[in-house]
Amino acid sequence: MGVRTTSKNAGPTGANSTPFVDGHLDKFYNSSFDRGGAGTNPEAARLGHEASGGAINVYTEPDGKIYRAHIFTASGTFAVTTASTNYPGVEYLVVGGGGAGGSISGQCGGGGAGGVATNMPGITNQDSVSLTRPAFPVSDGDSITVTIGAGGGGWNGGSPYSRLPGLPSKFGPTIEAFGGGAGGGGAAGEQFGKAGGCGGGGACSNPPSNGPGGYGNRDGAPNTQSGNPSGQPNSGFSQGRNGGNSGPYEAGFFGGGGGGAHSDGQNGGGAGGTGKGGDGLQIKIAGPTTATQPMGTPGPSPGGGYFAGGGGGGGNSGANPGDNSTAGAGGGGAGIGGGNSPTQNPPGTRGQSGQRSTGGGGGGVAYPLPGMHVRAGSGGSGIVIVRYQVGQTETSTAKATGGNISFYGGKTIHTFNTSSTFVTPAPFSETCEYVVIGGGGAGGFHNGGGGGAGGYTTGTTPISGSNTLTVTVAGGGANLIPGQPTNGIAPSGPPSGSSIPGSPSSWPGGTAGGGGGGAVENGQGANAPSPSPQGGSGGGAGRGYPGGANGGSAGSLGNAGGNSAPGGNTSTGAGGGGAGGAGENGQPTRGGSGGIGVQLPATFRDPKGGAGVPGPGGQAWWVAGGGGGCNQPPASPSSIPGGAGGYGPGQAVTPYAGGGMGGNQTGSDYNDPLAAQPGGMNTGGGGGAGTGPQSPEGRRNMGGNGGSGLVLIAYPT
């Protein structure tokens, strides 16, 4: 049976505001579903909830039951207009953000996965303990806030090294999945893994001091542990497992693996010790149990749908110094082994990050070379999925499969938030309209410029016959240390260069390249990366002290980043370019705003589908805005954020089109309310720029990650 989704159409509705929540763009997916008329079949006459929110996927199980899943990869609202008496309640999966891996010297621990809260039946951990929570009833008029926790940012220098846990995800006020604990770092007193939804792995330093793994939030687990006052309170339900202990500081050993939602992270040494991250859980809630799940990752059992895997621990050199520890199934990042030649992992190679929208923990790193800054893997962001049963009168059948499917304006729309395939059967013969958006570039930091938006392209292409077409949805650029190559190593000393660009999104109909990274201090914004003819927007210039600096140039699918402020001594950065206009130059008293984005074509302006975010005038369906440049006193007041993402020339306090707001100097914490904000998920927005040195240990506030890309495909219903 084909993929099913709602068949009734609705006209455009007003947009909603989009504040940032817990490090992610808070966008309300106004996804209302009207009821169809009753038929003569009693089962067909049964109706499900009339509800809105998130990206929608409606699917049929082998037993004939039809479910509607609301998938939230960014914060929003699940709103129930009318609750069903035929199919009461909802089932849910809530996953917190993953913790970062440990960094700096030593065998560092893997980050713990985000905790898992679910009432799906039959879900158990490695001890066969049921994780299934009670039923969740809903009523007419319920408006349930959904919060998506950001993953902890992997660090690259300074102290403390085991600092950045994931943030919690929530479904209403009562269902909370805690963020994962950060992995232990290599400095004295920092070797223990942090507690969290799943515990971070322990680390070991030289001189030797082995660190224990952090506690996961298990039923009956202590609230705190020795040396770790930040343990999460017990939830009353098991959420995750413990991190592994570090092995001794010897060749061939690893830091402990981060805990996963299903199993503990492995110890980093001794009999059977490999530093592997603990496995996550397979929860098939977003799609039919007989098909590959549209969300989650592959794992030991077929069908994907794994979430909350722990990050692998970092290694020491040994007989096989290129060996890496393994991440747990469910989106965790691999830890990195030591090495001593260019053909192996160089000492200090960065840990892999957890995958977005899985809650996976970040990978730990190995010992660094002298004078190197080393970055641990960041944790993956969390996710919330809500589903309920609906009747046959509320569905229609699509002609193709792939992505999340909706019907609007006589068209069938496939929305790809993650990489997948678009599959057409032999009778298929349609002219498909499409939009492809590349990943946004990261914002720079230390008086940086905003990241450039990913490339934006739209068009039509004929498709006939049986095809399995690869759809690649890009990730946004990571907010790495300025001047740091993609292997994660950078020389110490004054900052220079630019942050990491976004990646290209593609399908056979078209490709859109990533946006350029924002510059740092006196650096020039990065040009749009290759492929140049399809490149996105350029990154914004840094403050340009002592002289001026230029914004990055654009490819054919974007616009240039802004230049530094005149005068050369103003502590403000320029905005990154947007798909609809160039980034604003840095201003004498404020950061430049990111270049304006574009509004999706009319075909894709479906209020039920969830694509795009608000733009100028509060209108919805905008994408690919540039990241805002930074502010820093005394050039600008400390009470206002930096340049507005995606706004175009002028000043604002809220972002447009998925561009991240630039940061301002108010405090030392990475999670400061005026810290740089990331580009919006699935908008291709550029990340906002960070400000100058803040904390006693000399850290520099980080720029925001670039927003991930998007692919939309439509054809006549």
Per-range role (PLM):
Residues G2-T717:
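Low-complexity, glycine/proline-biased repetitive segments and flexible coils/loops
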